[in-house]
Amino acid sequence: MKNNLKVKLEELVIYILKNIKRYPNIIQRLKFYEQIHLGLTLNKIKNKREIYYNSVSIFKKQSIVDMLIKDTCNKLKCTQSDLLISTTLKGVFYGNITFYKNNKLVHVNLKGTSLIPDMNQIDRIEYTQKKCLIIEKDTIFSKTVREYISNDILFICGKGYPCRNTLLLVNKLNIRKYGIFDFDPYGLEICTKYPSIKKIGIDIKDINLIDKQHFMILNKYDIRKINTLLKQKVYEIELFYMLKNNIKIEIEGLFSAKGFDINNYFYTKII
């Protein structure tokens, strides 16, 4: 497969050089093809960011690399992983979990927070947890894994909008999934990106626990996003509440509330 792709890539380069006037970004293309060809030759996997940072002065922007990846996959009729380009890793997890590829151990995490490995290289995972808690924000994730006492929960953080790699891991988990997100339209939209998840916070009942100094008013972008989500008919109760009260709240407001007990909060929410 790799040798076949190398041949196709070489043929593509020849074609582009013969039709150079049709490709104004020829320098960027040739540099990109060079990196891909080298990766296929050495059987070395790279992610999008590595490709970009190897030639920042040529590519100028990450979006150029993203466009070239998509264009090359279309032209060669292959996938990103066929080109040995891995997904840029962003999400993290906390908990005992083992990852396998072709029955060979690829990654194991026994203690501490770890970056989710490239799930395109994983075909089997093993875990003992019965539940999964997905946390929107990295700061809240760090506080939760430090202070929340539980051995049967796997913690995952997508650091905002989850990347495809994070979603691939979540999809492989055959356990109950819960999530906590900001009480704003973007937090709710992020929640919709996760399949089969039960949102446990911030919910409207939690607002009574939060000091009003943490209440923020909606801006025009929030209102625009709310209207977009309402058209999708998701979380309508929360969205109408935000509009009616002109309010949004970050998770930090809940966690800093007077008398807030993180163990009691999650114990009553995660069942």
Swiss-Prot record:
One of its GO terms (molecular function) is metal ion binding. Keywords: DNA-binding, Isomerase, Magnesium, Meiosis, Metal-binding, Nucleus, Sporulation, Topoisomerase. It comes from the Eukaryota. This is Probable meiosis-specific protein SPO11 homolog. Belongs to the TOP6A family. GO terms for biological process: meiotic DNA double-strand break formation; meiotic DNA double-strand break processing; reciprocal meiotic recombination; sporulation resulting in formation of a cellular spore. Its EC number is 5.6.2.2. It comes from Vairimorpha ceranae (strain BRL01) (Microsporidian parasite). The gene is SPO11. InterPro entries: Spo11/TopoVI_A, Spo11/TopoVI_A_N, Spo11/TopoVI_A_sf, TOPRIM_Topo6A/Spo11, WH-like_DNA-bd_sf. It is found in: Nucleus. PANTHER family: MEIOTIC RECOMBINATION PROTEIN SPO11 (PTHR10848:SF0). The active site is at Y53 (o-(5'-phospho-dna)-tyrosine intermediate). It is an enzyme of class 5 (isomerase). GO terms for cellular component: nuclear chromosome. Residues 1-92 form the Topo IIA-type catalytic domain. Required for meiotic recombination. Mediates DNA cleavage that forms the double-strand breaks (DSB) that initiate meiotic recombination.
